[in-house]
Swiss-Prot record:
CDD domains: PDI_a_family, PDI_a_PDI_a'_C, PDI_b'_family, PDI_b_family
Alphabetized SUPFAM superfamilies for the sequence: Thioredoxin-like
GO cellular component entries: endoplasmic reticulum
Signal sequence, start to end: 1-14
Gene: BS2
NCBIfam families to which the protein is assigned, alphabetical: pdi_dom (TIGR01126)
Region (Disordered): 461-497
Site (Lowers pKa of C-terminal Cys of second active site): 441
Taxonomic lineage from the root: Eukaryota, Discoba, Euglenozoa, Kinetoplastea, Metakinetoplastina
Pfam families (UniProt xref): Thioredoxin, Thioredoxin_6
Contributes to redox potential value, annotated site positions: 379-380
Name used for this protein in its record: Bloodstream-specific protein 2
Active site: residue positions: 378, 381
Residues of the Thioredoxin domain: 15-124, 334-455
Species of origin: Trypanosoma brucei brucei
GO biological process: protein folding; response to endoplasmic reticulum stress
Length: 497
């Protein structure tokens, strides 16, 4: 009888918790998240400042009841196994589960309204059948971007491909599926994206999820739109080259270029996605390596981490911009590498200072490399510096390149090195892929990291310099002991006299 009562009480508690953030443990996790179509889970630790900032917004969102959706949280200090199961490496981490299975990580703003918007967008099917054209027209007024798949029925390849691809765009696009006869001006068996302001793009390529995903990533941004902190994430995932028009909105030349960007962006869409940024508000030119004496508007193309800069000796016009993009597409524009000057003496006490211009030389030297990416202003980097200097001296007489690079003043190829925080240390085996160092940044740990991955020579189990230091310490102790004895003997002699 008591057992039945406890079960009933637990179920009642669960029902009452539909408008709060449920506490999840390894014992109840799988069963609990399977109870709802959508379950948004926050992984946190109490000591994290960002977690503390998120907490009130999270609670406000959790207190609103949304059909078929629940919210929960995992304290990773008390539930380390759950944190490990989902490879939680930073806090807070928010993961969406759909029908009990991990679907995606939440990367939006951490406010109540944004969280609720995200949850609502993920409830129900990603693609809605449209029974008439007016339904789509109303959606175009309510949403910034609307996507319509024009197909005969829901069993076509277009329908199944769109349904799968749409899962990743629920927040940024509103999806419909409709019979072609409802849109007589459009080509049947195509996918049409409508953006506010009257812009439209059509996909009639292969019905493959990967190709359609690339199209949707591009088509949700305007032909020549402004990049802002709110939409930056949309541009950051585009695989096609992205061109940045850097403008000063109050200057005539910038106004003229900005007014032409929609037409230029539409014309050049197959080569490049064009955007503009107000450098008076967002001085991105500093990070892109644009010279301080550059004339504005300026233009920079970015592709696979490399920068391609339009001449900054003259202002960019519509004509020069179109010419530049076509030259770029033809492979006739060389990348502009942001780099500090090459130091006169590159290696001091075993540590090599690398700049962007010399990176490739060292990567192809035939040697293994241990490289530190740092920022001059970073406190953790300053604390780690003596340890890294000690490592450099330890391997000074070996074939290992122990190097450092100022990642704020030099171009870092993101396809080779993923640097998301400072300091970051990689071991690069000769001809191999970089391996990131993880763990406490102690001399012993870094030394063992090198010993584990080195390929061009053998590393002893114990560091040579540490052994020498211990030997030196013992000798110093012995010397001091002898000096003390000598002093005592001297005093005795004086007393005897």
């Amino acid at each position: 009888m008591r057992a039945i009562f406890l079960v009933a009480l637990a179920l009642a508690t669960m029902r009452e918790s539909t408008a709060e953030s449920l506490k999840l443990t390894k014992e109840n996790f799988n069963e609990t998240i399977a109870k709802s179509e959508i379950f948004l889970v926050k992984f946190y630790v109490d000591t994290c400042g960002y977690c503390q900032m998120l907490a009130p917004e999270w609670e406000k969102a959790a207190n609103e009841t949304i059909d078929n959706a629940l919210m929960g949280e995992v304290d990773c200090h008390s539930q380390p196994e759950l944190a490990a199961n989902f490879s939680i490496r930073g806090y807070p981490t928010i993961i969406l589960f759909r029908n009990g299975k991990e679907a995606e990580h939440y990367g939006g703003a951490r406010t109540k309204d944004d969280i609720i918007k995200y949850i609502k967008a993920n409830v129900g099917p990603a693609v809605t059948p449209a029974s008439n054209a007016e339904e789509v027209t109303r959606a175009k007024e309510e949403h910034d971007v609307v996507c319509v798949g024009l197909t005969a029925n829901n069993s076509t390849s277009l329908s199944t491909t769109l349904a799968e691809a749409a899962q990743s765009f629920r927040v940024s696009l509103k999806f419909f599926e409709a019979e072609p006869k409802l849109f007589p001006d459009e080509k049947p068996e195509t996918i049409v994206v409508y953006r506010k302001g009257g812009e439209k793009e059509v996909y009639d390529g292969p019905m493959e999820v990967e190709k359609l995903t690339e199209f949707l990533q591009i088509s949700r941004v305007a032909f020549g739109g402004e990049i802002t902190p709110e939409n930056y994430q949309y541009y950051s995932v585009i695989k096609r080259p992205v061109g940045w028009a850097m403008v000063k909105p109050n200057e005539t030349a910038s106004i003229e270029l900005k007014e032409s960007l929609t037409e230029v962006g539409k014309k050049m869409r197959s080569h490049m996605v064009v955007l503009w940024v107000n450098i008076s508000k967002h001085p991105v030119w500093r990070d892109f390596g644009v010279p301080e004496d550059a004339k504005y508007p300026a233009f920079l193309a970015i592709h696979w981490g490399a920068n391609y800069l339009h001449s900054t000796a003259e202002v960019v016009t519509r004509e020069s911009l179109e010419k530049f993009i076509l030259e770029f597409a033809a492979g006739r524009v060389e990348p502009t590498i942001k780099s500090l000057p090459v130091p006169e003496v590159e290696t001091v006490d075993g540590k090599t200072t690398i700049v962007a211009k010399t990176m490739q030389k060292h990567l192809t030297s035939g040697k293994d490399m241990l490289i530190l990416f740092f920022a001059p202003w970073c406190g953790h980097c300053k604390n780690f510096a003596p340890t890294f200097d000690k490592i450099a001296k330890e391997f000074d007489a070996t074939d290992l390149i122990v190097a450092e690079l100022d990642a704020t003043a030099n171009y870092v190829n993101s396809s080779t090195f993923t640097v998301t925080a400072f300091p970051t240390v990689f071991f690069v085996p000769n001809g191999g892929k970089p391996v990131v160092f993880e763990g406490e940044r102690s001399f012993e740990n870094v030394y063992e990291f090198v010993r584990k991955h080195v390929t061009t020579f053998k590393v002893s189990e114990k560091p040579a310099n540490v052994t020498e230091e211990k030997k030196s310490e013992e000798e110093n102790k012995s010397s001091k002991s002898n000096e003390s004895n000598d002093s005592n003997e001297s005093n005795v002699d004086k007393q005897d006299l």
